């Protein structure tokens, strides 16, 4: 297992869940968190602890977004009219790195962030290298022609894990995706149980 994978799987171990549904996740073999202290019996969490855990899990799923950036997304969701938890999920799923991951151009959110950052993705024919770039309904996202033979792309193209949510249309052969619509929380295929309502409660305390 590479250092990058070890760092990534710390989130799984800390949460005690297989966040991304990956077959190599260490929690498939362990029942405790990272480090020797992870083996101690866990006590019942306070309401704050439950909310914090929900926030850490959702933030971790999207490649462990920085706290500053994640709080900013919450604040934007809170300003908009409607169900704040639904809006939060919609904003997260509109991130370009999230769409690249959902389209299965690469295998993980971490790889998607790096892939976008290195300029391998076009949006409506123009190169975009900002992982947090927000896509709109109807946007076409594709892998640059020169990037289609990269090992990270070939690994994903040969994987059996090619299912994509119905709010993204994907041509896997051409490596082109279309963002059809902003999803509701119930549309998003999380491998682990997510509770965005608790995330809202967490930030509402401050």
Swiss-Prot record:
GO cellular component: small ribosomal subunit
Keyword Zinc: no
Keywords: Ribonucleoprotein, Ribosomal protein, RNA-binding, rRNA-binding
Signal sequence region: none
Region (Disordered): 1-46
One Pfam family named in its UniProt record: S4
Basic and acidic residues bias locations: 1-16
Keyword set includes rRNA-binding: yes
GO biological process terms held by the UniProt record: ribosomal small subunit biogenesis; translation
S4 RNA-binding domain mapped to chain residues: 94-154
GO terms of molecular function: rRNA binding; structural constituent of ribosome
Stated family: Belongs to the universal ribosomal protein uS4 family.
Function as written in the Swiss-Prot or TrEMBL entry: One of the primary rRNA binding proteins, it binds directly to 16S rRNA where it nucleates assembly of the body of the 30S subunit.
Subunit relationships: Part of the 30S ribosomal subunit. Contacts protein S5. The interaction surface between S4 and S5 is involved in control of translational fidelity.
Protein name (database record): Small ribosomal subunit protein uS4
Organism per entry: Parvibaculum lavamentivorans (strain DS-1 / DSM 13023 / NCIMB 13966)
Lineage: Bacteria, Pseudomonadati, Pseudomonadota, Alphaproteobacteria, Hyphomicrobiales
